[in-house]
UniProtKB/Swiss-Prot annotation:
Motif ('KMSKS' region): 616-620
Keywords for this protein: Aminoacyl-tRNA synthetase, ATP-binding, Cytoplasm, Ligase, Nucleotide-binding, Protein biosynthesis
Pfam families documented for this protein: Anticodon_1, tRNA-synt_1
Catalytic activity line of the entry: tRNA(Leu) + L-leucine + ATP = L-leucyl-tRNA(Leu) + AMP + diphosphate
One GO MF term attached to the UniProt entry: ATP binding
Transmembrane intervals: none
Protein's name according to its UniProt entry: Leucine--tRNA ligase 1
Xref: InterPro entries: aa-tRNA-synth_Ia (IPR002300), Leu-tRNA-lgase_arc (IPR020791), Leu-tRNA-synth_Ia_arc/euk (IPR004493), M/V/L/I-tRNA-synth_anticd-bd (IPR013155), Rossmann-like_a/b/a_fold (IPR014729), tRNAsynth_Ia_anticodon-bd (IPR009080), Val/Leu/Ile-tRNA-synth_edit (IPR009008)
Keyword presence, Cell inner membrane: no
The encoding gene: leuS1
Enzyme category, top tier: ligase
Record-listed E.C. numbers: 6.1.1.4
Top-level taxon of origin: Archaea
Length: 934
């Protein structure tokens, strides 16, 4: 709607800022320093509105503190590391039409550039420049001298230095472990290697070996091994492919999908395929009870989960019960767990209520949880097992809680050599960026960062208490993640990035090289290109001979050391909520390892997600909303507000035109209003009530805005700045025929400066109508720039309350008033009661206690009235008398004009001679007159 208007102004001032080097920051001991950072972005795509939310949230705070007199450093860098860039380049090289069309239509990459992006380094460089331009376009106040990429040779040496330190400390280890793995690319994966940025979560499943007929065996995965006693059949999927594999000298039947997955975990050999028609001709033997089990096929078995073979316990699983009924054969049900909450055969009870698969899943999960936490193993189990097992079963399983019985059942299965475990991706399916499904794989001699090291983990948990986390609820979430931290693989066999110095076949993965890079912001712009690790020992740890190193590198290392010591630690780290799962804990861990608690970030600010069309942004949903597109459509400053100030910090927001357009309209109205008011030229010198009132109101708003910004309540701050001040100015011009030029000019100066962190371009344009300086470097307004006039606030608030009450009465009677009758109550008795109520409110005496100490019937109503007043007004009323009638008379013309009535009559409610219209006299209270409309 106004995008051209906003953008022309924005690009004009961005050029001026860059020309004047406004945001280039150097050491300055005369000011308090503030070092603020955001995560550097992957350069495999343009910036989207999700990036924008985090980055602009940080920029607003950086701009605010700069105007508060801080020496603010806000740097930026770019991450080329990892598989995202490589995966996209590979897709383009393969000619994948959907990727290429997405690049052209959504990312707006020119056709003649597509071919060039087959080279991953050129792709990364292309999007680096695009991102840098977008960051500038959105108004980020960055010191661009300090930028770098993760392919910078200085960054490579830095990572070698960092990993060397971790290795010396014993935090880098090699061992065998199970990790999420891409079969196609041949390396372990983490969150940033997967489509949708999903961290693979690996869980263990129990496996029980069943002997079968014709020399076949069945490998059965289960989450409920204790129900082996009640198994009446085995189940396979009715139309999936199955295979026979050789494992530990025996032939086992599993699904083909399971084999493809388990071959990365187990030493299995494919023997042959087998049809489900042949499988159901076989039978199996329950290894605990000796019962002969039929093999049945149905649609309820997931061939991709576990082994694709399921043991059927219909008494306790509604899907199993339903599957058995669909065979149209008689079957036995053996309940082996009992609870007070569930029926004896909960699987049957669920099916009798519904056969809807979604509803049955809820029943299944409820049964599982109830039996696990509240269930006991039934005595009947003892009669189901052979004699040689009876003693163990009696002592360790019968009558035991399910939680204990499960452990003991597993021990029994192990002793019979029929137990095994497999690994599953519990939050799968998850796909690598190359398109392959991620599988669990046991990796031999893999390098890991030992985030599960007990001493290191304990230090990290302790450190969290010394870091301010905003909003506070994220602290518990972070503590839980650190508590559950496990080893993380450090290397990848392919991708872009730094090679492990002791194993050049491995490339350091993207989460492992993004934990300490904020150190580099302090010095990289003054560092020579050709350096060795020893330079970092001196700059960051103070180790080494400065003069010898200076001769070697030709650089003033003492100055670099001083700059590091000046800026570090990071005062405020901004990030999106997704990175609390990995980057933030890793960031804390690595700082602790090398520096102890000395250089931990002082504060971490975490914001929620941005959704488009009500859903998370995803290439598959084709709802990626690039930041450059948003700027073109709506304009820079409206987008800044929309992304940061329309929801609470941790709350997700849905970005769309209905969100941004009203903001753009209001900003344009504000611009036009200020532009018009700046041209006002009047001779009014006296300070009238209306002038005192608007000064007091704006003073109060500025105090609230300052508090809101420092507590990251941007939405509240913006509501005050965009709407409250605007409405107050409108009310002011209703109150006065001729404005006070000096007062208005002062308020406009304050308003423009207050807006500057949020909408810096509009603010800069307006500011230059009254000054030649940059508003970005001006002083942020303080409340004490304006005086407080409680009597003026009280007077105008009183008048506005009358107007509000009249409007409400008109709505009730559905009629426009022609005459207004106002009853006021100013008796000495009521005034004294009001002062007593004010004292009670100020002393935080509860209403019940206050009314208990007085017999006055209106005490409660008076208490409620004064409790709604600001403290400054309450304090004023304690020491000053007000004349309500005089206030109304003084503002009579304004009231008549605003209400559009022909007559306003004022009555003293204590005067027995005045009429009691509609019985309203008795309802008049101090500061709360009774009103009648006719």
């Amino acid at each position: 709607m106004y995008s051209d208007f906003f953008n022309s102004i924005a690009f004009k001032w961005q050029a001026e800022w860059e020309k004047s080097k406004v945001f280039e920051t150097n050491m300055d001991y005369s000011k308090p320093k503030f070092f603020i950072t955001v995560p550097f972005p992957y350069t495999n795509s343009p910036m989207h509105v999700g990036h924008g939310r985090t980055y602009i949230t940080a920029d607003i705070y950086a701009r605010y503190l700069r105007m508060k007199g801080y020496n603010v450093l806000f740097p930026f860098a770019f991450q080329f590391t990892g598989t995202p860039v490589l995966a996209i380049a590979d897709s383009i090289r393969r000619g994948e039409v959907d990727v290429i069309e997405f690049f052209k239509n959504v990312y707006e990459v020119p056709q003649d550039k597509i071919k060039e992006l087959e080279d991953p380094y050129k792709l990364a460089e292309y999007f680096k420049e695009e991102m840098k331009n977008t960051a500038k376009s959105i108004g980020m106040s960055i010191d661009w001298r300090r930028t770098f990429t993760t392919t910078d040779p200085r960054f490579e040496k830095f990572i070698h230095w960092q990993l060397g330190k971790l290795k010396e400390l014993g935090y880098l280890v090699t061992e065998d472990d199970v990790v999420g793995y891409c079969p196609n690319d041949g390396f372990p994966v983490g969150m940033h290697d997967t489509r949708g940025d999903i961290e693979p979560e690996i869980t263990t499943m129990n496996v029980i070996m069943f002997e079968g007929s014709d020399s076949y065996n069945f490998m059965v995965a289960t989450s409920r091994p204790e129900l082996i006693f009640g198994v009446v059949a085995l189940m396979v999927n009715h139309d999936a492919n199955y295979v026979v594999v050789e494992y530990e000298g025996k032939n086992f039947i599993i699904s083909e999908k399971a084999y493809k997955k388990l071959s990365f975990q187990k030493n299995m050999k494919l023997v042959k395929t087998i049809t489900t028609s042949d499988i159901v001709k076989l039978y199996a033997i329950n290894p605990i009870t000796g019962r002969k089990l039929e093999i049945i096929k149905n649609k309820y078995v997931d061939p991709s989960l576990g082994t694709g073979v399921v043991m059927s316990y219909p008494a306790h699983d509604p899907f199993h019960y339903l599957a058995m009924t669909e065979t149209n054969k008689e079957f036995e049900v053996i309940p082996v767990v009992e609870t007070e909450e569930l029926d004896e055969i909960p699987g049957e009870s669920a099916v009798l209520q519904t056969k809807n698969p979604y509803a049955l899943k809820d029943f299944m999960e409820s049964i599982y949880k109830t039996e696990y936490y509240k269930g006991y193993m039934k005595d009947i189990i003892l009669s189901l097992v052979p004699d040689f097992l009876k003693q163990y079963v009696k002592e360790n399983i019968v009558g035991k809680q399910v939680q204990e019985a499960r452990k003991n059942t597993i021990e029994l299965l192990k002793s019979l050599n029929i137990y095994d475990t497999i690994y599953e991706i519990s939050n799968g399916p998850i796909y690598c960026r190359c398109g392959s499904e991620i599988v669990p794989k046991r990796i031999k001699d893999q390098w890991f960062i030992a985030y599960d090291n007990p001493k290191w983990k304990a230090s990290a948990l302790k450190a969290i208490n010394n870091i301010e986390l905003i909003p506070n609820p994220t602290k518990t979430e972070l503590e839980k993640i650190v508590f559950n931290a496990r080893k993380e693989p450090i290397g990848r066999s392919r991708g872009i990035g730094v090679k492990l110095p002791w194993d050049e076949s491995q490339i350091v993965e993207s989460l492992s090289d993004s934990t300490l890079y904020t150190l580099l912001y302090t010095v990289i712009y003054k560092m020579p290109i050709n350096i060795e690790k020893e330079i970092f020992d001196f700059i960051f740890l103070g180790k080494g001979d400065a003069k010898e190193l200076e001769r070697k590198y030709g650089t003033d290392l003492i100055q670099l050391r001083e700059e590091f010591l000046y800026w570090y630690p990071v005062d405020q780290r901004h990030t999106g909520r997704d990175l609390i799962q990995n980057h933030i804990p890793f960031y804390i861990y690595n700082h602790l390892a090398i520096f102890g608690e000395k250089y931990l970030p002082k504060r971490i600010v975490i914001n929620g997600f941005v959704r488009v069309g009500g859903r998370k942004m995803s290439k598959s949903l084709r709802n990626i909303y690039t930041l450059s597109k948003a700027i073109k459509e709506f304009g820079v400053d409206p987008v800044r507000i929309a992304l940061t100030s329309t929801s609470d910090l941790l709350q997700d927001l849905d970005f769309n035109e209905n969100l941004v357009n009203p903001i753009a309209e209001q900003l344009k109205k504000i611009y036009d209003l200020i532009d018009r008011l700046l041209s006002i030229n009047t001779e009014i010198k006296e300070l009238r009530t209306a002038d005192e009132w608007i000064s007091s109101k704006v003073r109060d708003i500025i105090e609230k805005v300052n508090n809101n910004i420092t507590s990251f309540k941007y939405r509240d701050a913006v509501n005050l700045l965009l709407y409250e001040i605007y409405e107050i100015l409108r009310d002011y011009f209703d109150l006065v025929e001729i404005p006070n030029q000096e007062v208005i000019r002062k308020i406009l100066s304050i308003w423009i400066r207050a807006l500057a962190p949020f909408v810096p371009h509009i603010a800069e344009e307006l500011w230059h109508k009254i000054s030649s300086t940059f508003v970005s470097l001006e002083k942020y307004p303080e409340p004490n720039e304006l005086n407080l006039y409680p009597d003026a606030i009280l007077e105008i608030s009183y008048i506005n309350k009358i107007i509000e009450n009249v409007r409400e009465l008109e709505d009730i009677v559905h009629k426009k008033a022609e005459k207004v009758i106002i009853y006021i109550n100013e008796s000495e008795k009521v005034k004294e009661l009001m002062k007593n109520a004010i004292k009670a409110v100020n002393e935080e005496i509860p209403l019940r206690e206050f009314t208990a100490n007085t017999e006055d019937k209106i005490a409660e109503k008076v208490y409620v009235v004064v409790s709604k007043l600001d403290k400054a007004i309450r304090d004023y009323l304690l020491n000053n008398e007000i004349d309500e009638e005089q206030i109304i008379v003084k503002n009579m013309n304004f009231l008549l004009r605003r209400l559009g009535v022909s007559e306003i009559v004022i009555y003293n409610a204590e005067d027995p001679t005045v009429p009691d219209v509609k019985g309203k006299k008795s309802q008049a209270l101090p500061l709360s007159p009774a009103i009648v409309v006719e």
